[in-house]
Swiss-Prot record:
Name the record gives this protein: dITP/XTP pyrophosphatase
Cofactor: Mg(2+)
Summary of subunit composition and partner proteins: Homodimer.
Keyword Transmembrane helix: no
Lineage: Bacteria, Thermotogati, Deinococcota, Deinococci, Deinococcales
Any one GO molecular-function label of the UniProt entry: ITP diphosphatase activity
Active site annotation, chain numbering: 66 (proton acceptor)
InterPro entries: dITP/XTP_pyrophosphatase (IPR020922), ITPase-like_fam (IPR029001), RdgB/HAM1 (IPR002637)
Keyword Metal-binding: yes
Role of this protein: Pyrophosphatase that catalyzes the hydrolysis of nucleoside triphosphates to their monophosphate derivatives, with a high preference for the non-canonical purine nucleotides XTP (xanthosine triphosphate), dITP (deoxyinosine triphosphate) and ITP. Seems to function as a house-cleaning enzyme that removes non-canonical purine nucleotides from the nucleotide pool, thus preventing their incorporation into DNA/RNA and avoiding chromosomal lesions.
Length: 199
């Protein structure tokens, strides 16, 4: 099956391709297609905006995800606004802004959430959700990964996501869990309609 990956991030296309390799799908990028702005207030809405637009424009199934970091002490912020948190221009600045917001805060619990959506040109969608709980440090550690990875230690681990290899991170990450649910659903062929899975 040919599937469009609705992202401009080549690294994300590779990550998805590796996670779903056993399905034998032919994954392709956007090839110049511009996606709509993420205006949703939930991960599901933002993933749907991208996946449905790509599926309609390309006439093929399309896969998109939206993800974010939810911090308990900040009432779930930054959430769907994680990539734009504090209007900071890059990951380093967003991490510094988050640390400032958490200065003196004892409750450092947080979770990463990812919603992966597979949309078809006929309007059918499948939704898969993955979560990873953990704790935020008071300063960054590690050089791998991106986003808030240098601050986030998953429950049961001593290293941040940025201190793990890509392969290690993929096995436990929120996106990895959502993609694993999609893989499990499609392993034996297309699933029944109205599929929603959570791992």
């Amino acid at each position: 099956m040919r599937v469009v990956v609705a992202t401009g991030n080549a690294g994300k296309v590779r990550e998805i391709a590796e996670a779903l390799s056993e399905l034998g799908w032919q994954l392709e990028g956007l090839n110049g297609l511009t996606l709509p702005e993420e205006t949703g207030t939930t991960y599901e809405e933002n993933a749907a905006l991208k996946a449905c637009a790509a599926a309609l424009a390309k006439g093929l199934p399309a896969l998109a995800d939206d993800s974010g970091l939810e911090v308990a002490a900040l009432d779930g912020q930054p959430g769907v606004y994680s990539a734009r948190f504090g209007n900071r221009p890059n990951d380093t600045e967003r991490n510094l802004y988050l640390l400032e917001k958490l200065r003196g805060v004892q409750d450092r619990r947080a979770k990463f959430v990812s919603v992966v959506m597979l949309a078809y040109p006929d309007g059918h969608v499948e939704t898969y959700r993955g979560e990873l709980t953990g704790t935020l440090l008071e300063g960054p550690r590690g050089e791998n990964g991106f986003g808030y990875d240098p601050l986030f230690v998953p429950d049961g681990e001593t290293r941040t996501l940025a201190e793990m290899t890509v392969a290690e991170k993929r096995t436990i990450s929120h996106r990895g869990r959502a993609l694993a649910a999609l893989l499990a659903t499609h392993r034996n062929g297309p699933p029944p309609r109205e599929t929603v899975r959570t791992e």
